[in-house]
Amino acid sequence: MTTNNAENNSIYPVRWQDNKVWLIDQTRLPMEYGEVEITSSEAMARAIETMIVRGAPAIGVAAAYGMVLGAQEIKTNQKEEFLADLTRIADRLAQTRPTAVNLFWAIERMLKVARESGPEVAIISKNLLETAHNIQKEDVETCRAIGHHGLLALPEQPEKLTILTHCNTGSLATASYGTALGVIRSAWTAGRLIQVYADETRPRLQGAKLTAWECAREGIPVTVITDSMAAHCMQQKLIDAVIVGADRIAANGDTANKIGTYSLAVVAKAHNLPFYVAAPLSTVDFSLKDGTGIPIEQRDSAEIYQVGTTTLCPRNVNFYNPAFDVTPAALITAIITEKGAVTPAELIFLQDS
């Protein structure tokens, strides 16, 4: 079987160096590649809110390092006072993106480490940094496992596939490698991929700007389409499978992901195409029985009526800008995790794995 190499071209959107964090500024891609220096927990919160860093797993990593920066800001040697201040910092970070459960998972993990550490504040801070490093390292390993299991879950026929994806789920959205795009990378490396169709993903265009950039950078053939073209492409038999990521998955498999995902799932079902969700188990919120309890972030209307400095719409009209929608589990063929690919009904069995 022919193989391709997309393995050694890694991107790391969150980087710790010299007691500060460096973030790839994803708002400037693809026209300009640059990093932003983050030196405080508040700066990290703003970076998450403004989507300098985005993607549920990457947000979790960034928030963990935001907690480390916050710990450096606290001026006390008393553990109780330190924990009180750290909790306030955690609350601020938790307010940034309400849908992405990895954010809350990482923050709670950091708080747990702080609470369970000994009384010395210096040791607590050291443990927090070590935990943030571990969260980052674990996510890379998790994404590679998702890529492996996703490759095995893909349809056996045709031998070479054309895959449609939505938003950006690659290295930029994770610690590195990616979830849904990680599966696509694995398929490309294994010689099973013809090309990727990338929805542009309005209103922020993460597919056109970020997924296309990642694929082109790695030599993976990619075709960008507008969101409204997806059904036509399926009807014309240009698509063999759909793979998306997730920001929060309920216990029954209902999945919140970038707005427009639900439409893709409905149309994929109508055309008898497999629809996969690729996400780490940290994205699964087992406390929610179904998707009705998932909070949906509402973002600024300017994201709809303006691109860059260009106004697209009359300003004397109303705008509605939910960042996510919820795809019912019944429309999902399989959920691909680091523990394997399962049906939505089987997801609950991975809770304690």
Curated annotation (Swiss-Prot):
Under the heading InterPro entries, the entry gives: IF-2B-related (IPR000649), IF-M1Pi (IPR005251), IF_2B-like_C (IPR042529), Initiation_fac_2B_a/b/d (IPR011559), M1Pi_N (IPR027363), NagB/RpiA_transferase-like (IPR037171)
Q: What keywords does the record list, in alphabetical order? A: Amino-acid biosynthesis, Isomerase, Methionine biosynthesis
Report which reactions are catalysed by this protein: 5-(methylsulfanyl)-alpha-D-ribose 1-phosphate = 5-(methylsulfanyl)-D-ribulose 1-phosphate
Q: Name one GO biological process term.
A: L-methionine salvage from methylthioadenosine
Pfam families annotated for this entry?
IF-2B (PF01008)
User: Which residues of this protein are annotated with the site description Transition state stabilizer?
Assistant: 167
Q: What class of enzyme is it?
A: isomerase
Q: Does the keyword Mitochondrion apply?
A: no
Pathways involved: Amino-acid biosynthesis; L-methionine biosynthesis via salvage pathway; L-methionine from S-methyl-5-thio-alpha-D-ribose 1-phosphate: step 1/6
What residues bind substrate, as annotated?
54-56, 97, 206, 257-258
Its Enzyme Commission number?
Answer: 5.3.1.23
Please provide, alphabetically and separated by semicolons, the GO molecular function terms listed in this UniProt record: S-methyl-5-thioribose-1-phosphate isomerase activity
| Coiled-coil stretches | none
Active site per UniProt: 247
Task: Give the superkingdom in one word.
Answer: Bacteria
Its function, per the record, reads:
Catalyzes the interconversion of methylthioribose-1-phosphate (MTR-1-P) into methylthioribulose-1-phosphate (MTRu-1-P).
Family statement drawn from the similarity comment of this UniProt entry: Belongs to the eIF-2B alpha/beta/delta subunits family. MtnA subfamily.
By its UniProt entry, which PANTHER family does this protein fall under? METHYLTHIORIBOSE-1-PHOSPHATE ISOMERASE (PTHR43475:SF1)
Task: Write down what this protein is called.
Answer: Methylthioribose-1-phosphate isomerase
